[in-house]
Amino acid sequence: MCVMDTRERALIRQSGLPEIILSAKYPVCVRTESGKFIDSNSVFLHLIKCQNSNSEIWFSGIDIDTQILFHTVEVD
């Protein structure tokens, strides 16, 4: 298998990610390495993050234990 095949397969696997996020019954979000929210589902917006909240302000406003928890459970 060549490198291109591996990349293409990875893209195909990832192509359904937005639908999975939106259909999840539990809170889900996707953030960049810098901490910026780039996607989330309505459950996350309702239970955890106010829709109109600035991501950086929101993240800095949660307690340090929760920030650490978010960092440890992030998926690369």
UniProtKB/Swiss-Prot annotation:
Q: Which GO terms describe its cellular component?
A: cytoplasm
Q: Which UniProt keywords apply?
A: Activator, Conjugation, Cytoplasm, DNA-binding, Plasmid, Transcription, Transcription regulation
Gene3D superfamilies documented for this protein: PAS domain
State whether keyword tRNA processing applies: no
Q: Does the keyword Transcription apply?
A: yes
A molecular function (GO) term? DNA binding
> Any idea what this protein is called?
Protein TraJ
User: What role is this protein assigned?
Assistant: This protein is essential for positively regulating the expression of transfer genes that are involved in the conjugal transfer of DNA between bacterial cells.
Question: Which organism is this protein's natural source?
Answer: Escherichia coli
Q: Where in the cell is it found?
A: Cytoplasm
Q: Which gene encodes it?
A: traJ
